């Protein structure tokens, strides 16, 4: 079932009024990979009437008022990605296209969409509460360095003047807000819900205090300290509030919601999604973002990889939840009934596919300890379970109508070597690879990899060798390709040339999967970029801030110039 986007669609459902209206910077795609559809269906399954306004024109009241006034609240998200990332390249050039917009047209969402949409709502519905959510709001919930303006900005909750902010994967927190407002109409009573950020005029009596907005604005190393505290103490099992002074007020983060149980996760993904672009938006053109996920399966939520540059660890947490085999197989059966299904499940996974079935007894009871699970080596307490993942893939392949099952990306290759015999999994993985397996070594230089919290590049080479050798023995022409990042903190010309030489010597091809590091809010790497120090060691870090040099670093690794750059 599509959620309504117009009054006419409301009438067809017999709804005279909506309880909740969700506003998003993406086109409305009714698929579980799109946050608004996910939250919307979850709320409807609990008896609430929910409508969606996607990519409203923020210059007029026409779109934002078309569904009327909601009974409970507006929910606002910039979309699946930060609006500044959606609108600008790593060279700060305005993007001309947008994969989340019909027809791929750029410019359909405003910069800092969360703030703009909230201001629009407050202008025409000043008495209706506004609740922020999604990746942009979640990673900007405290004072944060904003690369596009090159300054520290206040919490998006303060800047937008919204009423509440839900961080992380927000199903249960949003449901709690809806239930309390439905019973009492009192937004103040929602401030006790886990997974919620709110502001207070008085200093909280308990919790961890982060360096203030003024402190981190004046002293970048205080920002690194704040990020470290936020990373270690944002954990459902530690149950500790975190707060930060911003001017005369305090931004308060309640402890996060606990990870969803397997039963809860199973129910979520089997809600009645259409898995299509809503007709209202489909008539405007194709939405490219659905093409890569339409026939994919999310099996895992969360990741304990702790890559410094990754926003998903900060958003989905290090606690891994995974769906039952029965739930996943049922979703596959649903996909096989789609008219345009051609027999291929394009991907099975999540942030890291081969964490399916894995766990850690310490993290599951006491929370994240002050060590990294996979860096510098895989912790002995972590339990790999690649057999269960392979069993899942084999079961999917047996379903009538399924000809191919692929794992296209999201494999943490160092985790495979935690098994007694890595070749057992690698051999099976060959069967489920669509020609090329995309891995993410990210760099080659030991210093840069250390700052990224990534394994030594030798493990990537060993995995690549074993995979391609086994594929050849099996009569398969399948290969491993790598993703790389340039311009990350710690990389100068020496490290960049090291990466170039590594590619030339070991890969045998010129990779196109190279991106320039973008300092996005809320990540450890961004804290390094702004502060010039590693938040966890306090060591000084070289940071290349020149856009011109960063672009040249990419050209150097892409072999667009003959010879190495001399610096």
UniProtKB/Swiss-Prot annotation:
Cofactor(s) listed in the protein's UniProt record: [4Fe-4S] cluster
Recorded coiled-coil stretches: none
Gene3D superfamilies, per database record: tm_1862 like domain
GO molecular function, one term: iron ion binding
Keywords: 4Fe-4S, Iron, Iron-sulfur, Metal-binding, S-adenosyl-L-methionine
Radical SAM core domain boundaries: 288-560
Alphabetized CDD domains for the sequence: Radical_SAM
Note on cofactor: Binds 1 [4Fe-4S] cluster. The cluster is coordinated with 3 cysteines and an exchangeable S-adenosyl-L-methionine.
The keyword Ion transport appears for this protein: no
InterPro entries in the record: Elp3/MiaA/NifB-like_rSAM, rSAM, rSAM_horseshoe, UPF0313, UPF0313_C, UPF0313_N
Any Pfam family the entry gives: Radical_SAM_N
Xref: SMART domains: Elp3
Residues of the signal peptide: none
Binding site for [4Fe-4S] cluster: 303, 307, 310
Family: Belongs to the UPF0313 family.
PANTHER family given in the database record: UPF0313 PROTEIN YGIQ
Protein name: UPF0313 protein TM_0337
Phylogenetic classification of the source organism: Bacteria, Thermotogati, Thermotogota, Thermotogae, Thermotogales
């Amino acid at each position: 079932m599509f959620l309504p986007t117009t009054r006419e669609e409301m009438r067809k459902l017999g709804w005279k009024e909506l309880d909740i209206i969700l506003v998003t910077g993406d086109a409305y795609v009714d698929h579980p990979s799109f946050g608004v559809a996910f939250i919307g269906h979850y709320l409807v399954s609990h008896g609430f009437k929910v409508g969606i306004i996607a990519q409203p024109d923020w210059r007029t009241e026409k779109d934002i008022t078309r569904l009327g006034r909601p009974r409970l609240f507006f929910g606002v998200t910039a979309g699946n990605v930060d609006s500044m990332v959606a609108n600008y390249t790593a060279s700060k050039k305005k993007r001309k296209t947008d994969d989340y917009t019909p027809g791929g047209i750029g410019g359909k969402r405003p910069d800092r969409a969360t703030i703009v949409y909230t201001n629009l709502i407050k202008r025409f519905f000043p008495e209706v509460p506004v609740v922020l959510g999604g990746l942009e709001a979640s990673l900007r919930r405290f004072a944060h360095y904003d690369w596009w303006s090159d300054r520290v900005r206040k919490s998006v909750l303060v800047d937008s003047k919204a009423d509440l902010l839900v961080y992380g994967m927000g199903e249960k927190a949003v449901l709690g807000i809806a239930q309390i407002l439905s019973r009492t109409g009192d937004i103040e009573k929602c401030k006790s819900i886990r997974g919620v950020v709110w502001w207070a005029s008085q200093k909280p009596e308990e919790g961890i205090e982060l360096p203030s907005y003024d402190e981190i604005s004046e002293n970048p190393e205080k920002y690194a300290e704040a990020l470290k505290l936020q990373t270690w103490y944002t954990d459902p099992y530690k149950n500790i509030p975190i707060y930060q002074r911003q001017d005369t007020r305090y931004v308060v983060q309640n402890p996060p919601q606990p990870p969803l149980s397997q039963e809860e996760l199973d129910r979520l993904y089997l809600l009645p999604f259409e898995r299509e672009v809503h007709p209202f938006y489909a008539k405007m053109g194709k939405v490219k973002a659905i093409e890569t996920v339409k026939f994919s399966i999310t099996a895992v939520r969360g990741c304990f990889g702790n890559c410094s540059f990754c926003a998903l660890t900060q958003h989905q947490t290090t606690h891994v939840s995974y769906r039952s085999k029965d739930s996943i197989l049922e979703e596959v059966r649903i996909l096989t009934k789609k008219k345009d299904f051609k027999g291929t499940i394009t991907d099975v996974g999540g942030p890291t596919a081969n964490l399916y079935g894995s766990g850690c007894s310490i993290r599951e009871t006491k929370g994240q300890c002050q060590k990294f699970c996979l860096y510098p080596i895989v912790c002995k307490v972590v339990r790999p379970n690649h057999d269960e993942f392979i069993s899942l893939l084999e079961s999917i392949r047996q379903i009538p109508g399924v000809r191919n099952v692929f794992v296209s990306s999201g494999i943490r290759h160092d985790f495979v070597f935690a098994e007694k015999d890595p070749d057992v999994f690698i051999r099976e993985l060959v069967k489920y690879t669509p020609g090329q397996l995309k891995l993410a070594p990210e760099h080659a230089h030991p210093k840069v990899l250390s700052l990224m919290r990534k394994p030594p590049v030798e493990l990537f080479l060993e995995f690549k060798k074993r995979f391609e050798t086994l594929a050849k023995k099996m009569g398969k022409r399948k290969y491993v390709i790598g993703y790389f990042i340039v311009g990350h903190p710690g990389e100068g010309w020496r490290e960049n040339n090291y990466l170039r030489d590594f590619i030339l010597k070991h890969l045998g091809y010129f990779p196109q999967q190279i991106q320039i590091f973008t300092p996005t809010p809320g990540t450890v790497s961004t804290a390094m970029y702004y502060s010039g120090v590693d938040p966890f060691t306090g060591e000084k870090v070289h940071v290349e801030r020149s856009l011109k040099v960063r672009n040249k670093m990419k050209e150097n690794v892409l072999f667009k110039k003959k010879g190495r750059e001399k610096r």
